[in-house]
């Protein structure tokens, strides 16, 4: 977790759901082989109205150009940020229920929307999170998700899926397939026949298996994979 100070009395003001892009704040630092700044998108995990700070959740990938740079920063150092980069403009009660199928650090956009639902007493949208990881130690924001589901079980539920589970693990294992999705979405009736939206975010291989390669930021493209098998429509993903 990286916490950045904002000017006193100000907040990020980002829309839900949206991201921002980061680069090194000093010219000449963290550049590619053409001398251009390395730029990476991240989704903040602090709510847009939180004053005085902005928090990013970043996984350390060895050899990652910007990852190595940001993990080398010290307290008091800065990062150049620009945004927002809008994704899905969240509207309370637009859908009866939503499903999130995510992997790794792809969980941060889901957390941004879940926080928005939780913070709005008028938003009755029900939400299911399917979060795939390799090991139990890889689960980001686990406590936050479990606390949310425990506090409002009638509105939120969480399913962790592990590829390499520890002994005694009771949750789903292996890859996220149609059976895992169908079972997880059953409680809140998140079915193709209902008023639903499914959000998918994670490594390219996972995204392709779940819904097919995305055409653009705002266009799913042809729907294939697990969600197509379950008869969801392109407009629902």
Please provide the spans of the model-predicted regions.
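Ferredoxin-reductase
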Residues: 1-77, 133-135, 163-164
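A short, basic/flexible loop-to-alpha-helix module at the beginning of a structural domain
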Residues: 83-94
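Hydrophobic/small residue at the entry helix of a nucleotide-binding pocket
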Residues: 105-110, 206
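Structural motif
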Residues: 97-99, 128, 197
């Amino acid at each position: 977790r990286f916490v950045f100070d904002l000017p006193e009395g100000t907040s990020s003001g980002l829309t839900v759901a949206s991201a921002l892009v980061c680069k090194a704040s000093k010219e000449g630092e963290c550049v590619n082989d053409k001398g251009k700044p390395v730029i990476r998108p991240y989704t903040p995990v602090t709510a847009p109205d939180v004053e005085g700070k902005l928090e990013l959740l970043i996984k350390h990938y060895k050899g990652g150009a910007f990852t190595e740079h940001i993990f080398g920063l010290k307290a008091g150092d800065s990062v150049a940020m620009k945004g927002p980069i809008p994704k899905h403009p969240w509207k309370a009660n637009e859908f009866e229920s939503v499903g999130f199928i995510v992997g790794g650090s792809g969980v941060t956009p889901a957390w941004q929307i879940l926080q928005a639902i939780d913070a709005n007493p008028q938003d009755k949208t029900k939400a299911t999170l399917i979060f795939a990881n390799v090991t139990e130690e890889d689960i980001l924001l686990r406590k936050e998700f479990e606390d949310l589901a425990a506090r409002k079980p009638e509105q939120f539920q969480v399913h962790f899926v592990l590829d390499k589970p520890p002994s005694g693990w009771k949750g789903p294992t292996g890859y996220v397939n149609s059976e895992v999705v169908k079972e997880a979405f059953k409680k809140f009736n998140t079915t193709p026949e209902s008023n639903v939206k499914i959000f998918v975010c994670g490594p390219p291989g996972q995204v392709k298996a779940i819904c097919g390669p995305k055409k653009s930021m705002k266009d799913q493209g042809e729907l294939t994979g697990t969600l197509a098998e379950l008869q969801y429509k392109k407009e629902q993903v």
